[in-house]
A protein has these predicted regions:
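Metal-dependent nuclease catalytic cores that hydrolyze phosphodiester bonds in DNA/RNA
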Residues: 1-135
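Residue-level signal for secondary-structure boundary elements
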Residues: 101, 229-232
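Mg2+/Mn2+-dependent nuclease catalytic core
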Residues: 122-230
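Acidic, carboxylate-rich catalytic segments that either coordinate divalent cations
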Residues: 235
Length: 235
């Protein structure tokens, strides 16, 4: 994956669409999915900003604009902290499946997978590039066609994993499977609690929804190519 590139000034920076067109790079599955609004995520951001407005006190002479900015900054800091914790947990699970660590997040995920898919050989954080013009890095999969994606979330205790998933989660897994040449994959979304990191809940997607999710993703991929005026599959 080419998430970053060395710029003209010799410093590393995020890869842009202009870089992709110049170098013949493909968008990731996540990049394609990000073209669609995520109401649940936006609602979470709004809630955090509102919570910040309650906790923070507006100065007597503080203009509304400055107070709003402080609330937005507090919300952004919370989001960045949650993302950082998610990245840390992902790394721990990856190291576990690579045989480099026996941490509790890995054990919780492995316990769920062993229960439903015993005796599988798992491959962690592997990349692919599809001739359809997209690519990605898969959290975990097996050569038998089981694709697993990890998400981190707060307050998982007592939750029903079936109520935690959205179509975008299924689309992501289906896009990975399609990119790796699997027509009838098994797809699994695993949620790990950000605080209680030994708590993992898994949802196994029904096979029938794979066709729908592939079509949904491919429609978004076509839309992305048209909006960005870039189709790497024709290069």
């Amino acid at each position: 994956p080419a998430y970053t590139i060395i710029g003209a000034n010799g410093k590393e920076r995020n890869t842009t669409l202009r870089d992709a067109k110049k170098e013949g790079l493909v968008p990731s599955v996540t990049t394609v999915l990000n073209i669609v609004a995520k109401p649940s995520l936006e609602n979470w951001k709004i809630n955090k900003a509102l919570e910040a407005s309650i906790e923070l006190q507006q100065g007597e002479d503080e203009p509304n604009e400055e107070f709003i900015y402080r609330c937005k900054t507090a919300q952004r800091d919370i989001g960045q902290s949650a993302a950082a914790q998610g990245t840390k947990i992902h790394a721990l699970i990856e190291r576990g499946f690579e045989g480099k660590s026996n941490n509790k997040s890995y054990r919780a995920v492995k316990k769920f997978l062993d229960k439903h898919f015993p005796n599988e050989e798992w491959i962690a954080e592997d990349s692919f590039c599809s001739e359809l013009g997209y690519g990605g890095k898969i959290d975990l999969y097996s050569k038998s066609g089981i694709f697993v994606d990890f998400k981190t979330k707060d307050g998982l205790e007592g939750k029903d994993p079936a109520k935690l998933v959205f179509d975008e989660h299924g689309m992501q897994l289906s896009a990975y499977a399609q990119g790796c040449g699997f027509d009838s994959p098994q797809r699994v979304s695993v949620f790990v609690d950000r605080e209680q990191t030994d708590l993992a809940l898994g949802h196994i997607w029904d096979e029938d929804s794979h066709i729908k999710h592939v079509e949904m993703f491919n429609s978004l991929l076509t839309y992305w190519k048209l909006v960005k005026n870039y189709d790497s599959s024709t290069l």
